[in-house]
Each structure stands twice: as structure tokens, then as C-alpha cells.
Amino acid sequence: MDKKTSRLRRATRARKKIQELGVNRLVVHRTPRHTYAQVISPANVVLAAASTAEKAVSEQLKYTGNVDAAKAVGKTVAERAIEKGVAVVAFDRSGFKYHGRVAALADAAREAGLKF
């Protein structure tokens, strides 16, 4: 089993557990160049989203694939979710280690007011 398959299996297990709970989830995806975050309802409707691929976020940054960029995405997605009335979410790390950019995004979202 390769690295990607292992990550996807971990992600599937976590998503099934969050689905059983029936709460909104903050989903994180990362690539070498960008970081993406979405708040998704139990009915699989995207309520809020932010990424370093967006001009509004990326023009504040020097480089989009680092911890500082992830912090900016976390803060932005939290602000947008709170505007929509979502304050409590479950954190879905998509099988990625809770380290580096993923942890930075989570911490920034918490500081901006999301609870998880």
C-alpha cells in the first residue's frame, strides 16, 4: 500500500465517524503549492471556503505553500464560517498528519473563533 492510499483510508475512517456525529466539518487539503479549507454541512453542502489559490488570500502572502499561508487560510475560513452562523465544527484533517501546515491552519481557525 502506498502513501496516498494509506492517507485516503485514514481520511475515509475519520469522515465516517464525523458523519455519524452529524456536525459541520472543517476539511483541510494540502498540496505542495496550496492549502485549501472548507466548512461542509452534514448534507455535504459547502458553507464556507478559503484557499491560497484565491487572489484575496494569496496577494497578502509571499509564498502560498508554507505555514504562514496556512494560518491565513485558517483565519479566513473561520471568519467566513462565523459570518454564515457556523461556530462549532469537527476538524477533518483528510488523513494528513496534525503537524506543520495542518496544525497551523487549525490553530488560526481556533484563534479566529471556530470551536473544535
UniProtKB/Swiss-Prot annotation:
Transmembrane feature ranges: none
GO CC, one annotated term: cytosolic large ribosomal subunit
A single BP term in Gene Ontology: translation
Keyword annotations from UniProtKB, A to Z: Ribonucleoprotein, Ribosomal protein, RNA-binding, rRNA-binding
InterPro entries: Ribosomal_uL18_bac-type, Ribosomal_uL18_bac/euk
Sample GO molecular function, one term: structural constituent of ribosome
Keyword rRNA-binding: yes
One Pfam family matching this protein: Ribosomal_L18p
UniProt keyword Transmembrane, yes or no: no
Quaternary data: Part of the 50S ribosomal subunit; part of the 5S rRNA/L5/L18/L25 subcomplex. Contacts the 5S and 23S rRNAs.
Its biological purpose: This is one of the proteins that bind and probably mediate the attachment of the 5S RNA into the large ribosomal subunit, where it forms part of the central protuberance.
Similarity comment: Belongs to the universal ribosomal protein uL18 family.
Name of the featured protein: Large ribosomal subunit protein uL18
The organism of origin for this protein: Shewanella piezotolerans (strain WP3 / JCM 13877)
